[in-house]
Curated annotation (Swiss-Prot):
This is D-ribose pyranase. Pfam families: RbsD_FucU. One of its GO terms (molecular function) is D-ribose pyranase activity. Belongs to the RbsD / FucU family. RbsD subfamily. It comes from the Bacteria. The keyword Cytoplasm applies. One of its GO terms (cellular component) is cytosol. Substrate binds at residues 28, 101, 123-125. Its main location: cytoplasm. InterPro entries: D-ribose_pyranase, RbsD-like_sf, RbsD_FucU.
Length: 134
């Protein structure tokens, strides 16, 4: 059995297969997933699992070069933004790019996978761009 926090087989496999520049999206329960993009559905019920818990676990296994947020996340100020800001300040999620929500949804077409959480706070979405460990 694995010793790291991430136990979900599909998510673990996806992270292990990421290359430099690949995109992994963590989305709220309402974020649409484009046809052809893998959906890793973790949602059980509203709020479970929440956005920040999933983000923390993903970061335990993924090297992130930069991240992308929708500008609406700053306006709606979901609780997840507090944690994202702290991770950004600590350098855990690399450089930041901000775009409008429509462009963010278009970006998901380039993702290797979208992780659907049970998060129901609006705009609780982040695109993580894979970095390298060397």
């Amino acid at each position: 059995m694995k010793k790291t926090p991430l136990l979900n087989i599909a998510l673990s496999r996806t992270i292990a297969g990421l290359g430099h520049g690949d995109i992994l999206v963590i989305g709220d329960a309402g974020l649409p997933v484009p046809p052809g993009v893998e959906l890793i559905d973790l949602a059980l019920t509203p709020g479970i699992p929440d956005f920040t818990s999933v983000l923390r676990v993903v970061l335990s296994e993924m090297q992130v070069e930069r991240h992308v947020l929708a500008e609406e996340m700053f306006q709606a100020a979901p609780l997840g933004l507090i944690e994202v800001e702290q991770m950004h300040a600590r350098g855990e999620i690399g450089q930041r790019e901000v775009m409008n929500h429509a462009d963010f949804k278009a970006l998901t077409r380039q993702a290797r996978a979208v992780i659907r959480t049970g998060e129901c706070r609006p705009y609780s979405n982040i695109a993580l761009v894979a970095g390298v460990t060397f």
